Design a protein with these regions (language model features):
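Acidic/polar, glycine-enriched structural segments that form the non-catalytic walls/loops
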Residues: 1-70, 90, 102-109
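Carboxylate/His-rich catalytic cores and anion/metal-binding grooves
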Residues: 36, 43, 74-118
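The feature captures the catalytic groove of carbohydrate-active enzymes
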Residues: 55-70, 117-165, 169, 173-225
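Solvent-exposed, acidic/flexible segments
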Residues: 9, 25-32, 36, 73, ...
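Sec-exported extracytoplasmic/periplasmic mature domains
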Residues: 21, 40-47, 85, 101-105, ...
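Short, solvent-exposed loop/turn and secondary-structure capping segments
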Residues: 44-55, 83, 93-96, 181-184
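Extended, well-ordered alpha-helical scaffold segments
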Residues: 31, 35-38, 92-103, 162-178, ...
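Alpha-helical support elements that line or immediately flank enzyme active sites
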Residues: 42-45, 77-93, 144-160, 164
Length: 225
């Protein structure tokens, strides 16, 4: 049966009340306070669908359906979700993690075909299905950072089912790929293969991002199992 406008208004009001009651901030500065509440509003309005809202414009494109860049750019996209767990809005991270988890079979295929490696490879730029762009294969670290997003979600929710069915499978595949990036050399130490740092194009051996995320990712995988 159809709902009258008052019933829709009431359910709408209750849904938003639930959102605002979970957390609040007071920086002592109206401008900063408003930025926080606006960010939470944007997240709740655009991160509840099948696909995550994109980092630029989300649902509010200024030029009709034209969206610059058209893809998910990891270095930008991840920042939308960093504050949501601390704000108590774990459910708003789900669409992003679902998007990444559903791309895992293709990421495993890319690891095999591009690197002749085990595990899963996700780079900076992906399309709507989560499939990698062909131009960023030297950018190795996004898959590790995404794995840690799964871990953060588990740490905040303590959801064992999520850990076993989603987080750990993703973390382990990321760790398996990262293992292939490290080579033991004549000095007895493991060194990272050449890769680009963040959005740069210069290939770096023993890049800081590879080394740091290898340590954190392996430790996280062991802790998770």
């Amino acid at each position: 049966p159809g709902k009258g406008i008052e019933m829709h208004r009431q359910s709408h009001s209750e849904a938003w009340k639930s959102i605002w009651n979970r957390s609040f901030v007071d920086y002592g500065d109206d401008y900063l306070n408003n930025l926080w509440y606006l960010t939470m509003y944007y997240a709740n309005a655009s991160q509840g669908g099948k696909y995550p809202g994109r980092f630029n414009n989300g649902l509010w494109g200024w030029n009709r359906d034209v969206q610059n860049w058209n893809f998910y750019f990891h270095w930008n996209q991840q920042q939308l979700f960093w504050p949501l767990n601390a704000a108590g809005h774990h459910e708003l991270v789900n669409s992003y993690l679902d998007f990444r988890f559903n791309s895992l079979p293709q990421a495993q295929k890319d690891a095999r075909e591009i690197f002749n490696a085990s595990g899963a490879f996700i780079s900076d730029v992906t399309e709507r299905r989560g499939y990698n762009s062909a131009g960023e294969n030297a950018n190795h670290t996004p898959v590790a950072e995404i794995a840690l997003d799964f871990w953060r979600q588990y740490q905040y929710t303590c959801d064992k089912k999520f850990l076993e069915e989603r987080a750990l499978p993703f973390i382990i595949e990321a760790a398996r790929f990262f293992e292939t990036l490290l080579v033991k050399e004549t000095d007895g130490l493991y060194h990272a293969r050449k890769g680009t740092g963040y959005e740069g194009w210069i290939e770096l051996k023993d890049g800081l991002t590879e080394l740091v995320y290898a340590r954190v990712l392996f430790k996280t995988a062991l802790e998770g199992v």
